[in-house]
């Protein structure tokens, strides 16, 4: 029906064929990145039917059980990776952030889909996805924020994604960026983000009045940080921030992964 499994090809009995944000959004974001790099619309033409089916499936899950109000735009089912492989907590904690990450990526996917539709001359679709993204933005703020740029439950990823995805007005975004930097300071000057937000955290800061602070975060070299991995001899990105721990012990995790901005 449009689900994009998070492992392809699907292995029966091993990999569930279910829709999940970020991983599934690759069917939209990767072709769009190719188009932006090459100017060639062919990949958009080829993938457009898949993109539409995917977003229709996301919409079905978001609306499951909800007919009215903002809840029908909150994407949390059937499964979300949430703040996957963040430095804090455990998998249960990461998965628990699924409603935030799922909804933010749902909004972003609709934004990008509107731009793709425009590039392909699909004006009705362009308008449809643009309007849907606006409704999702509103739903995110109603569900997760206090109306003044502060999350009801504060964590770095919850600010990074709506900042990078332009889900707030300028004044609100400035407050969100201030709050993000406050959380980073309170965490000893370290990021505290997983797969879904780390690629965007520097941009979320730099584009919203915190350029100097973004460079401070980039140059941090104690765990968790990018340069901590370099100090430990990494030449590729790890699956977790501290696959090699301070004491030299090595965890059972990938040391060549599609993670943290790689």
Predicted regions, residues:
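Active-site core of glycosidic bond-cleaving carbohydrate-active enzymes
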Residues: 1-262
